[in-house]
């Protein structure tokens, strides 16, 4: 929404659909206004790093170094130059940390204390609103809050009521406020975006029907209750596809030698099509029209589903499915005049019913179709049929599933009352407009829940990507991402780290752990190397640098989906903040002699010069200018994984 605000302020007229990454922008897209938002957030990381370091107790020189290191990170520079979310996430994460540190330093329950508490919760809510990984920042802040509560609980000068008040205030400010702010952003989002868009098919039929100009335009005249004789399309709630059949049959034998029923194929087709229409037929009647008055189909009723075009009944039997042999095959029954009889009876179970007498409703009801003879459930298996099945998703009958499998939920999306027994007239009905109007509305909480569920569970079918990397490759700096290349020269933009900076940060993580273990062992033996105030500052620096890095890095070790280098940027931001804290700690508390301190300062100056030289050396790949020769590009390669592009004509 912040990016959309930038586009709005840049007078964007909406005439660009953002369907493909890398698509060339037309003249109507205000590129500068869009890029201004992440660029501003990227720029703010520098003063935020300075303020955070100052709040940790670092000297002005140490805090200045923190901001300078942020400025010289090529990866942050590159990411902030594009319309991407990471700069916003990092900015709000650092703002959350700064506010949490300010809250910790403020006098309890003073006006400024309440202000910083609300600011911390707001910043955390904004971080979560940018990306779900903002939750990791919230957890980091909650760890600090929990340590404060633990410290207060041991303070005997405080009453039990006062400690409880601290707990309640932090729960309200650091948990409830971010949650309310997160929900509020979606409320505003849904208030502003009420029209249909190009990716509506990812959402449920009920969600789509609540949007203007999309499915609502198609379904606005539908009858509400499904009746015997109704003509319907059935959409899977799990996958954006519709129950479908065509005249092709299953092959007599599959590639693995198994035999099939050679019946008419039933699939789940991902596009709207005339072959998606089915007629809900009463099992004891030959009528294919809706009675007057209509007889609604209710929970528990037995129905037959007649394919509208081929006039074959939906069927299943004890034959293994084509791709998922642990399930039964689903077909439209073809009578070959052999001993295998059709079993075209299905029991309707309305899953979201208010009572057992509830009727089957268009768009509103989620239903399961239970095969009566075998007690199996109609569902999308998740597999895709081979060429003989036109690459369409497989539909199977599985054993009764508890809990309910998402692929077994079906929704009537399009619905009309059939009026003709003649096949030609029925086909004409399927192509004619719907005559009635029944509005379908979905409440905010239902929309909010569905959006969260889709964001958590939906995965685009991943293909092998050139720049996919692993978390361990991030630590070795053996991966990069090409963002742009000039069509005529070698000018290009790559997402690359500053090698000297990132290696130094990883070394500092190890050194901090070694120092922490040493201090803890000596304190266990009654030896305190640091005064209480310095020890607390040392722990606080570790909470921020080591804890922030681990909190934003370790979860990716458990992630199975494809990852890219930009996923590491929030963690890299935190480990960069540890460098000046550890250097100042070494200068103040570890190196005692004047000569040693001069040597440390000289080493720091030399190291900082190397970091700056590395930044300048890689700047052409961060900014896209000037164009480099193939030999120059080769000289910049720190790792074999840095896959630079060379123009064929260069």
Walk through the language-model features, giving the residues of each:
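Specific aromatic-rich, kink-prone transmembrane helix
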Residues: 48-51, 88-109, 116, 120-124, ...
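Short helix- or helix-capping micro-motifs
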Residues: 63-71, 78, 124, 128
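Transmembrane helical bundles and short interhelical boundary loops of multi-pass, membrane-embedded
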Residues: 106-108, 116, 149, 153, ...
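Short acidic/glycine- and proline-prone juxtamembrane loop motifs at membrane-interface regions
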Residues: 75-89, 133
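Transmembrane-embedded, aromatic-rich helix segments that form part
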Residues: 118-119, 133-151
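Interfacial juxtamembrane loops and adjacent helix segments
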Residues: 1-40, 488-492
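Lectin-like carbohydrate-binding module/patch detector with strong preference for beta-trefoil
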Residues: 190-443
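Transmembrane-helix motifs of polytopic, lipid-linked glycan transferases
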Residues: 32, 36-57, 95
């Amino acid at each position: 929404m912040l990016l959309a605000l930038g586009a709005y302020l840049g007078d964007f007229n909406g005439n660009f659909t953002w369907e493909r990454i890398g698509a060339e922008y037309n003249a109507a897209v205000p590129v500068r206004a869009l890029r201004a938002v992440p660029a501003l957030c990227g720029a703010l990381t520098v003063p935020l790093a300075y303020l955070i370091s100052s709040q940790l107790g670092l000297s002005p020189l140490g805090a200045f170094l923190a901001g300078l290191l942020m400025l010289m990170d090529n990866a942050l520079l590159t990411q902030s130059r594009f319309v991407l979310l990471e700069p916003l996430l990092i900015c709000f994460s650092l703002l959350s940390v700064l506010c949490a540190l300010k809250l910790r330093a403020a006098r309890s329950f003073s006006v400024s204390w309440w202000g910083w508490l609300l600011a911390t919760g707001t910043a955390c809510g904004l971080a979560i609103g940018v990306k779900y990984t903002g939750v990791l920042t919230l957890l980091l802040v909650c760890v600090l809050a929990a340590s404060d509560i633990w410290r207060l609980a041991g303070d005997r000068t405080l009453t039990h009521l006062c400690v409880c008040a601290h707990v309640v205030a932090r729960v309200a400010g650091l948990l409830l406020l971010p949650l309310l702010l997160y929900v509020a952003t979606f409320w505003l989002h849904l208030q502003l975006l009420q029209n249909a868009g190009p990716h509506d098919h990812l959402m449920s039929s009920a969600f789509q029907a609540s949007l203007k100009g999309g499915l609502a335009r198609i379904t606005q005249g539908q009858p509400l209750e499904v009746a015997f004789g109704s003509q319907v399309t059935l959409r899977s709630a799990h996958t954006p596809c519709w129950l479908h059949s065509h005249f092709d049959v299953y092959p007599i034998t599959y590639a693995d030698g198994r035999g099939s029923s050679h019946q008419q194929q039933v699939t789940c087709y991902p596009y709207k099509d005339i072959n998606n229409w089915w007629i809900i037929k009463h099992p004891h009647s030959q009528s294919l029209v809706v009675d007057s008055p209509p007889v609604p189909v209710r929970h528990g009723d037995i129905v037959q589903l007649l394919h509208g075009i081929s006039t074959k009944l939906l069927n299943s039997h004890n034959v293994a499915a084509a791709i998922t042999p642990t399930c039964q095959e689903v077909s439209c029954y073809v009578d070959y005049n052999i001993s295998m009889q059709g079993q075209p009876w299905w029991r309707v179970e309305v899953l979201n019913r208010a009572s057992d007498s509830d009727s089957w409703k268009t768009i509103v009801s989620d239903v399961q179709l239970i095969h009566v003879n075998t007690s199996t459930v109609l569902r999308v298996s998740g597999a895709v049929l081979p060429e003989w099945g036109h690459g369409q998703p497989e539909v199977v009958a599985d054993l009764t599933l508890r809990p309910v499998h998402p692929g077994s939920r079906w929704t009537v999306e399009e619905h009309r009352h059939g009026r003709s027994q003649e096949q030609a007239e029925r086909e004409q009905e399927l192509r004619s407009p719907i005559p009635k109007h029944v509005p379908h509305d979905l409440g905010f909480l239902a929309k909010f829940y569905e959006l969260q569920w889709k964001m958590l569970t939906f995965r685009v079918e991943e293909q092998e990507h050139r720049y996919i990397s692993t978390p361990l490759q991030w630590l070795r700096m053996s991966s990069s991402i090409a963002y742009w290349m000039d069509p005529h020269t070698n000018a290009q933009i790559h997402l690359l780290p500053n090698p000297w900076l990132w290696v130094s940060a990883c070394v500092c993580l190890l050194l901090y752990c070694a120092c922490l273990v040493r201090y803890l062992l000596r304190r266990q033996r009654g030896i305190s190397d640091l005064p209480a105030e310095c020890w607390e500052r040392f722990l606080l620096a570790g909470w921020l640098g080591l804890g922030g890095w681990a909190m934003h890095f370790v979860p990716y070790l458990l992630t199975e989906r494809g990852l890219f280098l930009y996923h590491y940027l929030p963690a890299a931001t935190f480990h960069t903040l540890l460098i000046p804290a550890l250097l100042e700690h070494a200068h103040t508390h570890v190196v005692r002699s004047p000569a040693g301190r001069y040597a440390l300062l000289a080493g720091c100056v030399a190291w900082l010069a190397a970091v700056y030289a590395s930044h300048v050396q890689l700047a052409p790949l961060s900014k896209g200018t000037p164009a480099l020769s193939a030999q120059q590009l080769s000289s910049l390669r720190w790792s074999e994984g840095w896959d630079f592009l060379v123009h064929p004509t260069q």
